[in-house]
Amino acid sequence: MIFLIAIIPALCWGINPLLVGKINGHSENEMFGMGIGDGLIALIFWLFSQPTVTISGVTFGLAMISGAAWAIGQLGQYISYRLLGVSKTMPISTALQLVGTSLIGVLMFGEWGSSNQKILGLLAIMLIVAGSALSAGTSDGRKKGFSCYLPLLMTTIGYWIYSCIPKLVKVDALQLFLPQMLGILIVAVGWAIYHQPTVYRDKQSWQNTLPGILYGIAAFMYILSARSIGVTNAYIIGQLSVVISTLSGLFFLHERTGQQSIVSVATGLLFIFMGCVTTALI
C-alpha cells in the first residue's frame, strides 16, 4: 500500500508538464494557477480531516519555508520548459534533485545505514543519473547555451530544501501540509502578480489550477510516503515522473529527438525505472 502512495506523486508530477504545455501560458500564468490549485487542495484536506493544530510556530514556519522553496524549484522548471523543452528539462532536473536529496538523506538523517544499503543506493543513483543523461537532449536537436540551463541549476536547491524539512520536524504529516501549501500559495501567486499585475484576468491562469490541484495531491502523498520509507526513497520513487513527462514531451508535445535515437531515450528511461525500483527495495 505504501508503494502505491509513493507512486502517486510520480504520476501527478509526470502528467503536469503535458498539461502545462497544452495550456500554453506564460510562467506567470503557471505559477498563479499552481498556487491557487495547491491552496484549494490544502483547504479541502484540512476541512475534511479537521486536524487539531499542535505544532509550534517554529514548525509552522519551517513548513511554510519548505513549500516556498518548492515553488522556487517549480518556477525553474516552468522557465526551462520553454528554454530546453519538457523532454530535456525533466531528465536533467531529475539527476540534479537526486544528488541533493540523496546526500541529505544519507548524511543528515542516517538513511541507507548498512554497507549493503549504501552499495544498493549508490547503484540506484548511478542507474538514474546514467538514465537521465541518456534521456536528455531529446527536445529539438539544437545545441543550447549554458544560460539556458541556469534557471534549472539555480532553482533546484528549492527542491532539496522542500524534501528535507519534513524529516526535521517530528509531527503528523497533515500538520505540515497546510503551512507547506500556504508557502507555495504566497510565493507562487505573489511572484506571478509582482511580475504581471493583471495575471488573474488571463484564462490560462485559471486553466493552470488543474496542474496546481494535481501538484497539491502529489505533495500530500509525498509527505506520507517520506515519513514511511524515508525522504531519499520517497523522492527517488517520485522521480519516475521523468518517464511520463519525457514520453509526453516527445509524443504529445511533439518535441523532436534530433540526432539522438529513440533507442537511447528508451534505454535511459529503463535505467531510471531500474534505479527507482532498486531504491524502493533497500
From Swiss-Prot:
Q: Name one GO cellular component term.
A: plasma membrane
Arranged from A to Z, the UniProt key words for this protein are: Cell membrane, Membrane, Sugar transport, Transmembrane, Transmembrane helix, Transport
| Residues that span the membrane, as ranges | 2-21, 31-48, 53-75, 90-112, 119-136, 146-163, 176-194, 209-226, 233-252, 262-281
Q: Which SUPFAM superfamilies match?
A: Multidrug resistance efflux transporter EmrE (SSF103481)
Major location category of this protein: membrane
The family database entries (Pfam families) matched by this protein are listed as: Sugar_transport
User: Which locations, inside or outside the cell, does it occupy?
Assistant: Cell membrane
Query: Which InterPro entries does the UniProt entry name for this protein?
Result: Sugar_transport
What membrane topology does the UniProt entry give? Multi-pass membrane protein
Molecular-function GO terms, alphabetical: carbohydrate transmembrane transporter activity
Q: Which family does it belong to?
A: Belongs to the GRP transporter (TC 2.A.7.5) family.
Name recorded for this polypeptide: Putative sugar uptake protein lp_2594
